[in-house]
């Protein structure tokens, strides 16, 4: 049996960094589902798709997302840093509420996680994508802490942003993600919640590794 680790939480809670490090420590696959929503968000925005449209299937039929060796490819082309911009994040949150987008990506994610040792992170991994995951984690942190992390990350990448704008976007994304009708951001009943506000990345990773070894001891 595979050991599947689901890590969920709001924007800026540390999911991506933590999940990647956990996967590296365990020597298993890592799936960034947030990147997949950013890919789709940018694709739909460039196509001029109206998020209020009853169907977005026609806009998605020519989009092929492949996952190979931890990397994403869109119609055969490697995905770059263009999906890491604040704009891409807002489009991801905007279009993620549409049922066609959820169905399109959930199907791909379920297939990727099927019978594989993997760390998958996002907002509905433990509740929708792999609800029977062997280990479920829900990371949280205050909006201010998450905004500060995101602000410094963007500054380091050369983006000119204001902390107040980043904080506002974090709060807006929280509202969009938690209030959407389909697969809203929520903690799975059996998930272990970890508040990362006052913890280092290493401390969070160590806590998750310990839990994984307790539940999947025969593999790690």
Language-model features, listed with the residues they occupy:
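Hydrophobic anchor at the beta1->P-loop junction of P-loop NTPases
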Residues: 7
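Conserved lysine of the Walker
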Residues: 15
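Small-molecule kinase domains that catalyze NTP-dependent phosphoryl transfer to phosphate-bearing small molecules
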Residues: 59, 69, 109-115, 123, ...
């Amino acid at each position: 049996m595979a050991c599947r680790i689901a890590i969920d939480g709001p924007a800026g809670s540390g999911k991506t960094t933590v999940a990647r490090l956990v996967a590296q420590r365990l020597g298993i696959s890592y799936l960034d589902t947030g990147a997949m929503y950013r890919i789709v968000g940018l694709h739909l925005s460039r196509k001029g798709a109206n998020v209020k449209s009853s169907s977005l299937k026609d806009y998605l039929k020519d989009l092929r997302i492949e996952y190979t060796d931890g990397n994403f490819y869109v119609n055969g082309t490697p995905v770059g840093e263009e999906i890491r911009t604040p704009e891409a994040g807002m489009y991801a949150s905007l279009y993620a509420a549409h049922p066609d987008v959820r169905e399109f990506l959930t199907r791909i994610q379920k297939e990727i996680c099927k019978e594989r040792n993997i760390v998958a992170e996002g907002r509905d991994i433990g509740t929708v994508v792999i609800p029977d995951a062997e280990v479920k984690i829900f990371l949280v942190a205050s909006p201010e802490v998450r905004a500060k992390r995101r602000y410094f990350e963007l500054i380091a990448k050369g983006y000119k942003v204001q902390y107040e704008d980043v904080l506002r976007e974090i709060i807006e994304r929280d509202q969009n993600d938690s209030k959407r009708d389909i697969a809203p951001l929520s903690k799975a009943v059996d998930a272990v919640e970890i508040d990362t506000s006052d913890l280092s990345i290493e401390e969070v990773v160590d806590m998750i590794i310990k839990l994984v070894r307790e539940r999947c001891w025969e593999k790690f």
